[in-house]
C-alpha cells in the first residue's frame, strides 16, 4: 500500500490542557597538549537567501543562453569586479534541480584559501541564492613569486610538526615538486598515513589582512590537518583545519526529557557506528549545518510544505552552540538552539533504533543506504517551530524510499510560550510513528496502523519509547512519569493517567479499551502495559542507564534496552493492523527468536497484571480480560 500515515501527539482539536549526559570526546590534539580550538579559521561568510538574491539580481544582466556555470561566473564578476578568482571543478546540479557552482578567490595567481563564493542556480537558469567570504581588503602590491622571499616548504613542515606536536618524523624530509603552482610532496618522513604535502597560499587573518602561508597537509589518522604556517616565519602557525571533523552540540543531553531535568551542555561527536558518515554527511556531501544522512532539520514558521531552502544554523566548524533561557521569548528568538536540539534528538534516536535493528533493510530513514538494502533517499524532514499548528506535533510516514516528515509546534499553554522541540519525549514519540509504520506490515506499506486499536498502539509505542529513554538511575518500579508535562505546562501531562506500575495511580486494564474511542486514549492503555513490561524485565535483568545498550549475541544485557528491543522486534512480526492480543503474542515471539523464550513467563506476568493474560480475547465491542498465566508459568 503506497499510502501515507500522519500521526499526531494529541487528538485534534486540543482543548485546555487543565542517563546521564554523554561524555565529551576529546580531540586527539588536545590529548597531545595542543588546543586545536585556538587555531580555528575565522568566520567570514555572508549569505544572501533566495528572497534577497531575487532583489539584488534585478539590476544585473544575464543571458538566457548562458549555462548555469556562466551565469554564476557573471554574478561573481559583477559582485567583485576588481577581484581575480577561479571556478572550482566541483559544480553539479542537485536532485532538486538547483545547480551549485563554487569559486576560489586568487591573488598573484595563488589561492586565498579561505575566500570562497558559492552560487546556486535554479531550474530556469536564474540565480537562486549565493554566499561568499571573499577578501575585501588591500591585496599586497608585490608579487611574492618575483623575489621568492618566502621560506622553504620543509621548514614549514617542521614548523607544523613542532607547533602541533604531531607524531611525524621530518628530520630527513625532502620536498618534491608536484602539479600545481608552488605545490610539493614530502619524501623521507614517517608517522603520517600518507606523504605530507604543502601548497603556497594566501590566508585571510582575523585582523582583516592577508598572510602568505604554507598550507601543510598531514594525515595522522585521528587528525587530518591543514596547517597554515607563515611563509616568512615557520615558527608561526596562523590557523588549522581538521578534516576529521568534531561536531559539538549545546543541547539537553540524551536522557534529559525537558528543561526541568537539567541544563544544556556541550556534547561532541555524539554519533555511533549506526551513522558511519556521521550526522553531517550522506557519504557523498558534507554539510556544515543541521543536515546529514539521517535527518534534515530547519525552522518552518509559515507551516509550508517546502523545506530545502528553509533556515538552518550554519557552522563550517560544526560547532552548534547557541543561547537559550527559560524566559526567552518568542521561541523564534532561539530558533538556532531549537533546530539544533531537534536535529540532535532525532539523530540520537535513529542511532539507538539502528542498534536494535531498524536499519536500511528494515526501512529506516536514510538518504544513503550504503548498499545495505531497503530504499534510500528518505531521511527524516524535521521542522522546528512549524507554523501550521500549535500545542501538538505530528509525523507523516510514507513508504520506504520517501522521506518522513516531522512537524514540531510551539505550545501556547505557558507564558512565555514553549517550544515542543525542547521536550525530547515529544520528538521521540513522533519519530516512533515512523518506526512502527515502517515495521508493521513491511517498509512498503504505510497503512498497517490505521484501525482504531492498531492506531492506538501506534500512539502507545511512541509514549513507551519516550518514557523508557528518560529513565534515571534513581528510578524504581514505583517511579511515575507523565507525557508532555513541560510543553503542556501541566505536571499531569497530556494523558489521562501517569505511567505507573501502581494500579491505584494508573488503573487501566485491557478491558478499559472497551469504553475508549480515541487512539491516544487507547495508546495510553498499551503504553501502560509496556511500562509494566519494562520494569518486569529490569527486575529480571537489572537496569543500565547508559546512552547505548551493551549487546551479547545480539541481546541487550539490561532490562530497559531489552524491553525496547523486544517491543520493536514485535512490530515487525505482527500482522497488518494488529490488536492488543496479537501484539502481545508478537512480543512473546520476538523473545523466542532472540532469547529462546528466556523471558516468556516474565512477559506473561507483566501483561496478565493488566488483564492481557492467558485467555484474554479480542472483540471490538466486548474485549475479555484475563489475569491468568499459561501452563508452565
Curated annotation (Swiss-Prot):
Top-level EC class as recorded in UniProt: hydrolase
Similarity comment: family membership: Belongs to the peptidase M36 family.
EC number(s) stated in the UniProt entry for this protein: 3.4.24.-
Cofactor note: Binds 1 zinc ion per subunit.
Record GO terms (molecular function): metalloendopeptidase activity; zinc ion binding
Propeptide segments, given as residue ranges: 19-246
Protein's name according to its UniProt entry: Extracellular metalloproteinase 3
Keyword presence, Secreted: yes
Cross-referenced Pfam families: FTP (PF07504), Peptidase_M36 (PF02128)
Domain of life: Eukaryota
Chain positions carrying an annotated carbohydrate: 410, 480, 622
Function comment: Secreted metalloproteinase probably acting as a virulence factor.
